[in-house]
Every structure is written in C-alpha cells, then in structure tokens.
Amino acid sequence: MTLDLSKPATAGYLSGFGNEFATEALPGALPHGRNSPQRAPYGLYAEQLSGTAFTAPRGHNRRAWLYRIRPAAVHRPFEPFTGRQRLVAEFGDSADVPPTPPNQLRWDPLPMPVEPTDFVEGLVTMAGNGSAAAMNGCAIHLYAANRSMQDRFFYSADGELLIVPQQGRLFIATEFGRLDVEPAEIAVIPRGVRFAVALPDGDARGYICENFGALLRLPDLGPIGSNGLANPRDFLTPQAAYEDREGAFELIAKLNGRLWRADIGHSPFDVVAWHGNYAPYKYDLRLFNTIGSISYDHPDPSIFLVLQSQSDSPGVDAIDFVIFPPRWLAAEDTFRPPWFHRNVASEFMGLVHGAYDAKAEGFVPGGASLHNCMSGHGPDADTFEKASAIDTTRPHKVDATMAFMFETRTLIRPTRYALDTAQLQADYFECWQRIEKHFNPEQR
C-alpha cells in the first residue's frame, strides 16, 4: 500500500478542531484500552508524539499516539544539508537580519524557479521575530516550486507550519494520512510531523507562517456567541493511511533555521493507526462566517480572526491569522474600506486571489506587504477618493477576493533577502503621495 500522490485523495477526513481523534487503516490496529501494550497489534511499534509539555493543562495539552511499522528513530545520523538554504530562525541583529526600517514595505510575487525545485528547496524566509530556539515568535516564509518532492521527506523541529497556498494545489502526505490543499484553503503541519509535498499542477507558490510559540487555536467568540468566524466542524484532519515502502530515501530536518539531511531506508509514512489531538489539519477559508457592521463604521479587523497563538499577556496574541474574504458592506455614512491606521502590532499581508479593497493597484496575488509597529498605512489615494464619494445607502459586495494577514505583537523584522530582493517595490510609498489636502476651516 502506498500514499499515491499522483492523483487526488479518495479517503475522507475527520471533522473538528482539536478533537481527540482515533483512526486506523487496518481493523484492530489501535490497541484497546491502553496506549503502549506489551505487544502492539500487527507487530507495530507504539510511539508518542508530544506537542506540549506533559504537564500542560488538560485543555492545552496536545499529543498523539502513533502505531507504526518502525519507530521514528530509525534513520542514519544527520549531516548538514548542502542544497539551497535561505531560511532564518533567529531574529536578532545578524548578517541575515539587518536593522529594521520603519518604512512601509511591499513586494511583487516570488518568481517561479527556472531549475527543478521542490517545496523544501523553494523556501525563503522574508521576515519574522523572536527565536526558534527559545520557542517564541515566528518566521514568515514564501515558497515557489515546480516539482514534487521525490524520495524525500521533511519536518520542522522549529514550529508548526501554517501554509497558505496562492497558486497550485498541494498534495501533502504526512505520518497521519493525506491532506489535499488548494488555494483559498490552508494547512497546518504540527512541529515535528514528517511530510512530503507533491505538486499536481506543476508550478506552486504560497506563504507560510512558522509559529515558534504556543500552538494555534480558535479564538474565543465573546459577545458574538456560540457560533461564527471559523467554525470548529470545518477543520479537517486526515484519516490514517500508510505505506510500507523501502528504498534509498532522504529525511530533511529543520532545526534552529538550518537544514539537515539523513539517509533513511524506509518511508516514514508507515503509521497504520493513531489517536490523539496533535495532528495536521486543513481549513477552507471560503467557509469563514464573516462578521461586520450593519449600522455604521468599519469594526476592528479582529472580527476576521481565524486562528491565534496566545501570548502570556491576556488579550494580546503572539500571532493572529486574519483573512479578508468576500463580504457585504452595508454601513451607512461610513468610509467602508479599512481606515488609515497606526498599530502597536505589526502586520504582514498577502493576497491569494482578486484585489484587496484598500489598494487599487500594486498589491497583487502572490505579493506581500509589511507595515510594522506604528508605521502609518491605509487606503491609497484612488481608493480613498472613490470610497469617499460612493452611495452608502446601497450595500456593496466585496467579491472574488481572499487577502490575509499575519499580525504579531512584536516587531516583524525583514531578512536581508527581503530587503535586497528585486521584488521589493521601491515606489510603494508613492501610493499615498497623491492624497490631497481637503481641509477648509471655513467649510464644515
């Protein structure tokens, strides 16, 4: 049996966010009534994968028990990976992380590679904060690839990977089973989970937020009530699937921002059954239940929050993943696009498809922008003039779009690559320079 990544998956998914799942690819492969029997069914090995401390409170504790053909320890020693490496995991001052300018920054899309490039080889770090070694903060990567991973497997020990495809589907094989992900969906691969990515459409491009800190969770809804935003039932986790395949394979590990490789003589996708609440999942952003004003004003963008990584300060998240999906705008006598803003938090934005309603041009699918702490930002001149004159007695639908934001409590520091790349738009600031002075003290 193999996890055939050459065609779409046929198995279904398990529904729910953070559930205690139990799934087996062979009948009776899950031990009954215990986690680690003296002899596991089918001659399997029992292995626990811990995503939090053993003593974390029950509501935050994440772990899974895997029943596999060989333990994860079975591989040759790691050695430095000699292929292309453009990753950063420490965001203090260094050759990779120069002083952070207060300028608003915007980039064109990462070009598609000319040479054959898989998902791992196509990764590049654009920005981040904190430290993978200290397990706080995040790294923001882009990827551009044009070939599937071949006899190669990958995992990150640095953090969980929130993957946002922008172009091209991803067929992702993991130790837990299969995820098929397309643009307008996201996938989350937990820290330490081994996976491989196939590209059924050839070229693929997208964004990744690698979360070094507390695991992503659904936000509390407060006065919204018991339903709304991203509903738990719409998060999908793989059913158990396995392959018993031997050969000359390569296992790549990411640790403290560096890539390492080891020879491995079998596929690590040999988990026949598993149970627990620490597992990969995907979510369709088009299912987000958008909340907005039906009277006046544009509410704070926290109403668009999909997932959060909490910090030690109540009400202040380390990372927020926010989307700006299709939605109706109905507020009267209101400037409907996102307003002009300076923020104590820092904002890295991307665009999956369509146009963002605060920028008439320049911010294109696959591109990105960074507005750091207290850097002024907001609609460009054309957007402001149009929105200031529109008839707000009639509702308007923002359609055929999907923008998103990684917002963090601490400064997002662009890497040397991000500041030196030809994709950096040197004229981004010009979009605000044509904003006119309308002030007249004689006319209210």
Swiss-Prot record:
Keywords: Dioxygenase, Iron, Metal-binding, Oxidoreductase, Phenylalanine catabolism, Tyrosine catabolism. The active site is at H298 (proton acceptor). Fe cation binds at H341, E347, H377. GO terms for molecular function: homogentisate 1,2-dioxygenase activity; iron ion binding. Homogentisate binds at Y356, H377. GO terms for biological process: L-phenylalanine catabolic process; tyrosine catabolic process. It catalyses: homogentisate + O2 = 4-maleylacetoacetate + H(+). The keyword Protease does not apply. Pathway: Amino-acid degradation; L-phenylalanine degradation; acetoacetate and fumarate from L-phenylalanine: step 4/6. GO terms for cellular component: cytoplasm. InterPro entries: HgmA_C (IPR046451), HgmA_N (IPR046452), Homogentis_dOase (IPR005708), Homogentis_dOase_bac (IPR022950), RmlC-like_jellyroll (IPR014710), RmlC_Cupin_sf (IPR011051). Its cofactor is Fe cation. Pfam families: HgmA_C, HgmA_N. The keyword Cytoplasm does not apply. It is an enzyme of class 1 (oxidoreductase). Its EC number is 1.13.11.5. Residues 92-111 are annotated as: Disordered. Involved in the catabolism of homogentisate (2,5-dihydroxyphenylacetate or 2,5-OH-PhAc), a central intermediate in the degradation of phenylalanine and tyrosine. Catalyzes the oxidative ring cleavage of the aromatic ring of homogentisate to yield maleylacetoacetate. PANTHER family: HOMOGENTISATE 1,2-DIOXYGENASE. Belongs to the homogentisate dioxygenase family. Hexamer; dimer of trimers. This is Homogentisate 1,2-dioxygenase. It comes from Burkholderia vietnamiensis (strain G4 / LMG 22486) (Burkholderia cepacia (strain R1808)).
